């Protein structure tokens, strides 16, 4: 009718159009007097009733990532599109949800790999987000949203703290004390032998609980290597977290592993000997970090004192010591019997044997000999004598 306007009108005799086909729309009309309108044409109309398909390819569900880029695929050009990051814990990200509009050049049909969206904002470190991609094609058909859940964004490297062994120390055990600020995807510890050319480092790959965050005390690794007795090493700890952030390398320098206990041989005094001095002769196989010489009363004249005397550094040097008087010599009781013992630990803490001489008599009193027969000023007919001894 005159003056009528038809909006979104479906013609009664409309035929089925083919999806994805481009048409020209031609309108021909005639009034009641038979006057024709002529051709009214709207060219190049694309008939599209198929929903656009889009998918987030990366990151994937429950991924740990250290980047803001996304990879996605679009089946046809879009008129509008967004990707939304929603924090699972919105308290940690007050700006959540972060709705990022996709630019026109980012909405062309195809696959997009590692794209940093033009409108992308920074995300909060160590926060987990859900991602959702929405969009509508040029015909305003809205696609089914593509969702990715529980993506953990981690931009910080893990922190490795090494607490044992210390630099420049001797160790009798190969365990390691370390602390991790977060779970690791990969970690390795290498022992690099020092002062030796052409030696390949001995490396252990961390496994299972060894990769978990927290304190790891006296850890003997599952795949521990056999280190060389007496050799010195640098320890190198390399790792990266679940998002593949690389840690600053942890390093412990110049650790010498010593698995052999020191040997001490007490040469003087000997068991059951009688001596008039406190001198000692002994042999030590290696330098001792600490050592003592002990005289323990066992018999004879009573001695109530303890005689435990530390050896000075030069007295702990390896090799033989001949008849030396210790700097810290004991004050023994004349006529007493002692067990004499030297004992010590090497720089790695390995204990020595107990080098002992038993029942050693300490005697600084000169013996007294009394002749009872013959007496003075007498004539004798034989050479027989009689005498008394004050001691053996």
PLM segments and residue spans:
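Solvent-exposed serine/threonine-rich low-complexity stretches and specific carbohydrate-binding patches
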Residues: 1, 94-109, 199-213, 304-318
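Signal that preferentially marks extracellular ectodomain short beta-strand elements
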Residues: 2-21, 32, 106-126, 138-139, ...
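Conserved structural position at the C-terminal beta-strand
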Residues: 27-29, 133-135, 237-239, 342-344
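Flexible, low-complexity linkers/stalks enriched in Thr/Pro that connect modular domains
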Residues: 31, 41-52, 137, 147-161, ...
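A structural signal for beta-strand boundary/capping segments at domain termini and interdomain linkers
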Residues: 36-38, 142-144, 246-248, 351-353
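Surface-exposed, proline-enriched loop/turn segments that connect beta strands in immunoglobulin-like
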Residues: 56-60, 162-166, 266-270, 371-375
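Short, solvent-exposed loop/linker segments at the N-terminal edge
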Residues: 61-66, 167-172, 270-276, 376-381
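Solvent-exposed loop/turn segments flanking beta-strands in beta-repeat/beta-sandwich domains
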Residues: 74-96, 180-201, 284-305, 389-392
């Amino acid at each position: 009718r005159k003056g009528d306007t038809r909006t979104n009108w479906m013609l009664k005799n409309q035929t089925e159009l083919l999806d994805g086909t481009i048409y020209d729309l031609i309108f021909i009309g005639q009034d009641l007097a038979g006057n024709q309108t002529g051709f009214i044409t709207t060219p190049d109309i694309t008939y599209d009733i198929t929903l656009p398909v889009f998918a987030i390819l990366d990151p994937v569900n429950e991924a740990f990532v250290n980047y803001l880029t996304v990879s996605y695929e679009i089946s046809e050009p879009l008129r509008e599109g967004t990707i939304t990051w929603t924090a699972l814990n919105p308290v940690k990200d007050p700006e959540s949800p972060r709705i990022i509009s996709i630019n026109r050049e980012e909405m062309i049909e195809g696959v997009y790999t590692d794209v940093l969206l033009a409108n992308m904002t920074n995300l909060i470190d160590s926060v987990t987000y859900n991602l959702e991609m929405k969009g509508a094609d040029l015909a305003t058909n809205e696609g089914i949203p593509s969702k990715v859940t529980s993506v953990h964004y981690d931009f910080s490297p893990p922190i490795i703290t090494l607490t044992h062994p210390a630099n420049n120390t001797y160790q009798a055990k190969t365990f390691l004390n370390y602390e991790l600020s977060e779970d690791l995807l990969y970690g390795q510890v290498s022992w690099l032998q020092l002062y030796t050319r052409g030696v390949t480092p001995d490396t252990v790959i961390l496994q299972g609980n060894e990769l978990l965050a927290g304190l790891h005390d006296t850890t003997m690794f599952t795949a521990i290597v056999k280190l060389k007795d007496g050799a010195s090493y640098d320890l190198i700890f390399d790792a990266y977290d679940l998002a593949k952030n690389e840690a600053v390398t942890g390093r412990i320098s110049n650790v010498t592993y010593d698995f052999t206990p020191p040997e001490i041989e007490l040469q003087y005094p000997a068991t059951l000997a009688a001596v008039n001095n406190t001198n000692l002769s002994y042999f030590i196989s290696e330098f001792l970090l600490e050592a003592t010489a002990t005289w323990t009363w066992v018999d004879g004249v009573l001695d109530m004192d303890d005689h435990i005397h530390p050896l000075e550094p030069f007295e702990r040097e390896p090799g033989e010591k001949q008849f030396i008087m210790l700097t810290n010599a004991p004050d023994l009781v004349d006529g007493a019997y002692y067990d004499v013992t030297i004992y010590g630990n090497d720089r790695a803490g390995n204990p020595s044997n107990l080098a002992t001489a038993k029942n050693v008599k300490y005697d600084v009193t000169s013996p007294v000999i009394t002749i009872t027969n013959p007496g003075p000023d007498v004539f004798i007919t034989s050479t027989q004598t009689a005498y008394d001894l004050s001691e053996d």
